[in-house]
Amino acid sequence: MEKIVLLLAIVSLVKSDQICIGYHANNSTEQVDTIMEKNVTVTHAQDILEKTHNGKLCDLDGVKPLILRDCSVAGWLLGNPMCDEFLNVPEWSYIVEKANPANDLCYPGNFNDYEELKHLLSRINHFEKIQIIPKSSWSDHEASSGVSSACPYQGRSSFFRNVVWLIKKDSTYPTIKRSYNNTNQEDLLVLWGIHHPNDAAEQTRLYQNPTTYISVGTSTLNQRLVPKIATRSKVNGQSGRIEFFWTILKPNDAINFESNGNFIAPEYAYKIVKKGDSAIMKSELGYGNCNTKCQTPIGAINSSMPFHNIHPLTIGECPKYVKSSRLVLATGLRNSPQRERRRKKRGLFGAIAGFIEGGWQGMVDGWYGYHHSNEQGSGYAADKESTQKAIDGVTNKVNSIIDKMNTQFEAVGREFNNLERRIENLNKKMEDGFLDVWTYNAELLVLMENERTLDFHDSNVKNLYDKVRLQLRDNAKELGNGCFEFYHRCDNECMESVRNGTYDYPQYSEEARLKREEISGVKLESIGTYQILSIYSTVASSLALAIMVAGLSLWMCSNGSLQCR
């Protein structure tokens, strides 16, 4: 008995060598969401949603925007006298127009297919203005008298700079027949108009002829216009109206004009010298003297993140727009420091290293690794190979998400005239619906990728554990907490061989077998002793019980409580 007690004491005092498999932990409080859980604390995370801008209008890749200030696109193209600063403009990256610019059509009227023209401008980066019909060439008509107080310049009546309002001369208005052949290599934007007088008296006063027309023709256009004489309310002091038209004249095509009155003739046209990605943005901002790769109406974005929630309308190399308020991608592991002793929940993908109850804050040079203890001491060592593979996989995750979302829906900010409000409302609903779906897809993708990332790390820890288990086999005992207890002495060289996969099982198998047998013998001898003590205890207890029963019976017989024969 004394031998057994002494052996057990010796065994308990000699601590076996151990190696444990674990993972990195730190003091991070960053949290991500997954398919299965919300607010999961992780060691590392990356915010992939840009939420900030600089509140300025900037150059786009070094090219200035065309900021029209108080002028509209129509005021710029026709040449409103208050927009003279834009008579000749350099190349632009995008066009900025206020929501309600003051200098629009100074003479009241409308611009036919104006929204379509704006859409065309969203694919143009530079105009070159050229003269196609000189003002001085109208010898049979008054080319300088067509002015209005509605379009003042320096306190005097004026008119749009790029067109000519032709009036009768010497009480006659000869029929006009003019042509222009586009000999340029570029397309040409040509503008003209028709004047609608207030009454018949104004018609004859300006054009002499009571019944007039305007005919315009190209290889693709066949237009005949007649003035609409009607009494109207005054706008800008005018009861008349001017309606403007435009067309794109292809190279080697000709445009032909014929009219006997009410003609607003083109003097200048715009040669489209550079096409490319542009946009017309509605913004009240001023020029910020800055440069960017991505511009929105409310400010520039300088970000390498794949998503943003700033504004759906953008131009340039921009992140994808979503309506989300938070998109955080897990790039590290579940952060469960060992002191918390908190088991991880099972995920949706991959193997789970749930048998390891916490991470190691002492292991700082890798995501997964080992902790050993032997006679030479103890320490941490990262598994560089599995860590590097994991880093490579996670590093490509953002690019993977971008690739999966590379069919970005673009809200182009189309404009509609007053007759197309139902179409505009339908378009807005469709765009909102697309953006809702796009946002849902982005959020779902991030949730699934986070789930995969965390379970990917769990799987890597489990694989590392299995790698050690398959090497050690019965030379060590699994303790159930990610650790192995060796049945032999394992110095630092031995520990390193386990870590790098070169552990020599036969070298240590004999020592391990003897240790196992020694432990088994102690257990068996202990079990035998316990059996003898158990039998002795049982017999002694039974004998004592019998004596007590006999004594009780004799006492009862002596006092007559029990009849004895």
UniProtKB/Swiss-Prot annotation:
UniProt GO MF annotations? host cell surface receptor binding
Q: Which residues are glycosylated?
A: N26, N27, N39, N181, N302, N500
The record's Gene Ontology biological-process terms are: clathrin-dependent endocytosis of virus by host cell; fusion of virus membrane with host endosome membrane; fusion of virus membrane with host plasma membrane; virion attachment to host cell
Taking the first listed entry, what is the main subcellular location of this protein, grouped into a coarse class? virion
PTM note says: Palmitoylated.
User: Any signal peptide, and if so, which residues?
Assistant: 1-16
Mind telling me which residues the site (Cleavage) is annotated on?
Answer: R346, G347
Quaternary structure per UniProt?
Answer: Homotrimer of disulfide-linked HA1-HA2.
HAMAP family with a match to the protein in the record: INFV_HEMA
The similarity comment for this entry is:
Belongs to the influenza viruses hemagglutinin family.
- Quote the protein name from its UniProt record: Hemagglutinin
Q: Which organism is it from?
A: Influenza A virus (strain A/Chicken/Shantou/4231/2003 H5N1 genotype V)
Recite the lineage of the species: Viruses, Riboviria, Orthornavirae, Negarnaviricota, Polyploviricotina
What gene name is listed for this protein? Answer: HA
